């Protein structure tokens, strides 16, 4: 239900719902891929289990010490969803080049210089725009992270964020 509504009315859904992107069933590569999103609603949060699958939705990865990305060729179908794993200090950057949008998960917000010919920067969200370093030090039992969800609708990209805490298990 959340995913269907998100595709048709992204602005409203992104501002009112919470999402969690679970990448454990995804074959990870430095390049992004198309994915299938399987959704479950649990305790008011839409959990998305994503897996490799030919579809109109995309995933772009975190790559340690670099910037993982996915390219999406235009024209783009309305309702296309683009996701990445959680961010807790990284930057989200979107560039446009040769009729393609490129979504980057810039590790630690400092690795875009390793990418060549990225095109025109359309959007960049630095960690300081979504992250307060005081949050990270509040607990040794939870790791905070931000989940970004991007949806294409009527010629525009709509970007939303949902904050969650991961539980850290100690022996």
Predicted segments, located by residue:
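Active-site microenvironment for binding and transforming phosphate-containing groups
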Residues: 1-171
């Amino acid at each position: 239900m959340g995913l269907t509504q998100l595709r048709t009315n992204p602005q409203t859904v992104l501002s009112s719902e919470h999402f969690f992107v679970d990448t454990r069933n995804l074959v990870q590569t430095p390049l992004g891929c198309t994915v299938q999103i399987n959704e479950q609603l649990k305790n008011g949060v839409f959990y998305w289990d994503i897996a490799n699958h030919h579809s109109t939705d995309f995933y772009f990865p975190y790559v340690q010490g670099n910037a993982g990305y996915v390219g999406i060729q235009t024209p783009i179908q309305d309702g296309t969803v683009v996701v990445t794993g959680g961010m807790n200090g990284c930057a989200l950057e979107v560039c446009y080049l040769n009729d393609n949008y490129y979504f980057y998960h810039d590790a630690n917000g400092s690795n875009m210089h390793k990418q060549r010919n990225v095109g025109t920067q359309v959007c960049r969200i630095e960690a300081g725009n979504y992250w307060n370093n005081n949050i990270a030090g509040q607990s040794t039992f939870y790791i905070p992270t931000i989940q970004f969800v991007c949806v294409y609708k009527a010629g525009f990209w709509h970007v939303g964020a949902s904050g969650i805490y991961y539980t850290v298990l100690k022996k």
